[in-house]
């Protein structure tokens, strides 16, 4: 079986001498290679600015040194840059916050249609390049590619298509007509697929309710399923981690860890404020406590995201100044895409803070639960998708404000040793039972079923 996979980006970077390398990326992109355990994969993605001028095709095994049971080839596609930039702006500033129940800007109708056309154009170009007569079906990932299934259906009417929504679907639908038009636009494209997969049951329900209440959208002939992404437990546990960094914390020192992209939904500023509120009550006789922030700069081409990075840096400085009486620097900011260093921190944390305003899943939570060696506690929020599976074994903040997070941290600190051990055990058991292999197998199974129909 051969499946054509289409995504916004591929995990490909390059060295200073332009040699292709495997680049650690967030979200669903980094787990897509798992599909190659069950089928041959031709993966088509858009060329990012940093990859312009580089080769257009790669063998994944050659650049990653990862071996899968089936072939995995990556193809990069260049599309019209002006349309891509316009679509990216709209996805970043309007669709992304809309899907995460955040405020959205006002738009005029003409502008809205221009953005829709830009997204349609990019989706059509990508889909046309991803078509191959030898493919048995197509798997599309990313809300930015919501219109790809429509083009695939036109060009390959008899091939099965699965669309995976890795973000949430909004839980409260805004009343303004622009927001409704955008959600109808997304849903119309997604409904061209045979199967639509979601991270949580709540997201599936909200999407289903939206379609039912907004004709002429209809679900006839479309299967909706929950298939949450997970982690490759064996690979995670077997990966070599750097020795440096393990000595930065003494055995009795307390580690608070927050790993995220620099994105408003990740609630990093509230996390810093919550720790600061807690640390104001630390005394010199207590073991030292550190909040290590591992931030991957995100969407830095946009002024708002540049501003957020500046705000975070400034907030760290101010908080450390407030806590200067402790005699050490309790908040440490690590900026960059250093997966190995972040993974090493996950083995050592006492408290992993993932209190996003909203999150499709948050794979860091699952990675942390598997890698941690100290019965560390995960402090999260109900709006993090992974909590649908793991919430019973985490501390959930009642509110996603700094005060709410600080209260949850206090609750976590007051847990008994036995409670921590049981929570850690149950987290590992749950993730091991429903690991990445099960997710990938479920994706491929749909194509095998539909192929027979």
Predicted feature residues:
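Catalytic cores of carbohydrate-active enzymes across secretory and cytosolic contexts
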Residues: 1-453
